[in-house]
Curated annotation (Swiss-Prot):
Record's keyword terms, sorted: Flavoprotein, FMN, Monooxygenase, Oxidoreductase
InterPro entries per the UniProt record, alphabetical: Alkanesulphonate_mOase_FMN-dep, Luciferase-like_dom, Luciferase-like_sf, SsuD_RutA_monooxygenase
The UniProt record lists the keyword Oxidoreductase: yes
Miscellaneous comment as given in the Swiss-Prot or TrEMBL entry: FMNH(2) which is absolutely required for this enzymatic reaction, is provided by SsuE.
Organism: Shigella flexneri serotype 5b (strain 8401)
GO molecular-function term, one example from the UniProt record: alkanesulfonate monooxygenase activity
Name of the protein in its database record: Alkanesulfonate monooxygenase
The keyword Oxidoreductase is annotated on this UniProt entry: yes
Length: 381
């Protein structure tokens, strides 16, 4: 099985070390462009663009990278409860059209009540997943070309429709990650690819089996992906030294503050990440070559595969054997590590190299009539 390898645009900051200004660098448009173009040339399938108040806006960043890349896809967040499903569907179709079919979408429900309140969202965990399920139903139906009437608890639309369809048919793929039962149920019913953070293989296997069984109950099959950091070097010793350097400026106070911030979230996935290290620096290798040091201060994906190229490739293939076909990777700093992964890891894997998409001709059209419909020729009888 050929593997889809993704990279990451660090719109929330970048540098050589975690938890310090030491060795940091400015993340401006030029720097993000360098990373995107490196990923484009090296054969990555796409890049994940993060979302939230600590990041630059993912949609604007993705749009700005379209003209400077050729085949790279952009995995951008959909935010139920923050954006209406109709507006999100129009945005998604436009991004897909402007990128010539290089748009992918990541459903993000949110997990930090404090940040969500700042965005005007006051739903609890269960309610957010209810809202996400309704949002996704409307979003998908619109992109499928339907005129949608929907009266739910959280979404209510009447006569909603898209005038401009996406390039990818039936619609651009929808990604989603969540570890709670209600999250897995949403994934099983509605998404195309289920993402998990980098837990030990036996725990990932459990999640895949659970989601696969739930999807089968809906008569569906879905794909699987995993989100991991990577520290790859020419030798295993060099890789582990690099891992230790990454957290060499971390002090206990910074770790404690980070863990306290994570504790206020209601994310089951974040709780599982925190349980891998319990906020302690000792015994961070939680599974062969799987290191939890990143999660001491970084929310979300908190583990890294560490080793030389063949070693890391072997671990990736272990996950692939569980049914994972997409790997969303990152490393610090992201420009240098994009090259290291491409040069030291890719030669040991069966990497699916994306082709440059051929331009898709759009149907000619006049201006929309009354902002309501596109004029079409009437067939002569």
């Amino acid at each position: 099985m050929s593997l889809n390898m993704f990279w990451f645009l660090p719109t929330h900051g970048d540098g050589h070390y975690l938890g310090t200004e030491e060795g940091s660098r400015p993340v401006d448009h030029g720097y993000l462009q360098q990373i995107a173009q490196a990923a484009d040339r090296l054969g990555y399938t796409g890049v994940l663009i993060p979302t939230g108040r600590s990041c630059e806006d993912a949609w604007l960043v993705a749009a700005s990278m379209i003209p400077v890349t050729q085949r790279l896809k952009f995995l951008v967040a959909l935010r139920p409860s923050v954006t209406s499903p109709t507006v999100a569907a129009r945005q998604a179709a436009t991004l897909d059209r402007l990128s010539n079919g290089r748009a992918l979408f990541n459903l993000v429900t949110g997990s930090d009540p404090q940040e969500l309140a700042g965005d005007g969202v006051f739903l609890d965990h269960s309610e957010r997943y209810e809202a996400s399920a309704e949002f996704t139903q409307v979003w998908r139906r619109l992109l499928l070309g339907e005129t949608v009437n929907f009266n739910g608890k959280h979404s209510h639309v009447r006569g909603a429709k898209l005038l401009f369809p996406p390039i990818q048919q039936p619609y651009p793929p929808l990604y989603f990650g969540g570890s709670s039962d209600v999250a897995q149920e949403l994934a099983a019913e509605q998404v195309d690819l289920y993402l998990t953070w980098g837990e030990p293989p036996e725990l990932v296997k459990e999640k895949i089996e659970q989601v696969r069984a739930k999807a089968a109950a809906y008569g569906r099959k879905i794909r699987f992906g995993i989100r991991l950091h990577v520290i790859v070097r020419e030798t295993n010793d060099e890789a582990w030294q690099a891992a230790e350097r990454l957290i060499s400026h971390l002090d206990d106070e910074t770790i404690a503050k980070a863990q306290a911030a994570f504790a206020r979230t209601d994310s089951v996935g974040q709780q599982r990440m925190a349980a891998l290290h319990n906020g302690k620096r000792d015994n961070l290798e939680i599974s062969p070559n799987l290191w939890a040091g990143v999660g001491l201060v970084r929310g979300g994906a908190g583990t890294a595969l560490v080793g030389d190229g063949p070693t890391v490739a072997a671990r990736i293939n272990e996950y692939a054997a569980l049914g994972i076909d997409s790997f969303v990777l990152s490393g610090y700093p992201h420009l240098e590590e994009a090259y290291r992964v491409g040069e030291l890891l890719f030669p040991h894997l069966d990497v699916a190299i994306p082709e440059i998409p051929q331009p898709q001709p759009l149907n000619p059209q006049g201006e929309a009539v009354a902002n309501d419909f596109i004029p079409r020729k009437v067939a002569q009888s």
